[in-house]
Swiss-Prot record:
It holds the Pfam family H2O2_YaaD. It comes from the Bacteria. The lineage of its organism: Bacteria, Pseudomonadati, Thermodesulfobacteriota, Desulfobacteria, Desulfobacterales. GO terms for cellular component: cytosol. GO terms for biological process: response to hydroperoxide. Belongs to the UPF0246 family. This is UPF0246 protein HRM2_41860.
Length: 256
């Protein structure tokens, strides 16, 4: 079983990222499997000026400047293990900095972080600060969008690392999950969805859903879940499994 997670735009400051001594010894950073493809994207981005980056990413002057600095200095700063490199709402709820060494090893064996720059990341992979996501209209070649650039390599990686009778538990955002949920993989993909009632209607509230994805992943890690069916019994932060509205490959958890 593999669990997929999306990255976050907010990234850790490598100079301020300090791991507890008892877990730092457990982490030996590895190199991303698609490191060469990531380097090719960085070379492509180095051809953009600050003004062009601002338009490409639709960001402020300050963020465009920071992004340019990250691109030009890519690989020159201290890398951070992927599981500690991202700091969005999902990762705050996950709180990997509080994990035991055994929990981090479980993550290394079972968690995959999808990335628009690196393709797939192991939690222990060395990551440099960057800004890139699939909303970015970066042309990677003739009729080659960023999504097309990554679809085949990511599919091949999952097919090589998972048998047809294995599972992928999807805790990624739709932007990243669509790389694996639109078919073509040998393994079965099960998406966990989180909903709550608003005005008598079940809805997905983005901010709450992000937090729930992090909390559910934390529970999966702490309980060392290796069979997806175990997740149906989870009662986390008020969310419980609703079999009436769930589907075969989309399990819905409703906030009570």
């Amino acid at each position: 079983m593999k669990i997929i997670l999306s990255p976050a735009k907010t990234m850790a400051d490598p100079e301020k990222t300090m791991l507890r001594p008892e877990i730092e010894s457990e982490i030996i950073m590895t190199r991303p499997v698609f490191e060469q493809r990531a380097q090719a994207l960085i070379r492509l981005l180095k051809g953009f000026s600050e003004i062009e980056l601002k338009a490409l990413f639709k960001v402020s002057d300050a963020i465009a400047r920071k992004t340019l600095d990250q691109i030009n200095g890519f690989g020159e700063t201290r890398p951070v293990p992927a599981i500690f490199a991202f700091q969005g709402a999902v990762y705050k709820a996950l709180a990997p900095e509080a994990f035991t060494g055994e929990s981090l090893v479980f993550c290394r064996q079972n968690l995959v972080i999808l990335s628009a720059l690196y393709g797939v990341l192991n939690p222990f992979d060395a990551v440099f600060a960057h800004r890139l996501d699939f909303t970015c209209k970066l042309e990677c070649g003739a009729n080659m969008t960023l999504r097309k650039f990554w679809t085949s390599p990511i599919h091949e990686w999952f097919d090589e690392n998972l048998a047809a009778d294995e599972f992928i538990v999807n805790l990624a955002s739709d932007e990243y999950a669509s790389l694996v949920t639109k078919g073509g993989l040998k393994a079965r993909v099960i998406t966990l969805a989180f909903m709550e009632k608003k005005g008598g209607v079940l809805k997905t509230v983005a901010a709450h859903s992000k937090q729930a994805r992090g909390l559910f992943l934390r529970q999966i890690v702490q309980q060392r879940v290796t069979e997806p069916g175990m997740i149906k019994s989870f009662k986390v932060a008020g969310y419980t499994y609703d079999g009436k509205i769930s589907q075969k490959n989309r399990w819905v958890f409703v906030l009570k």
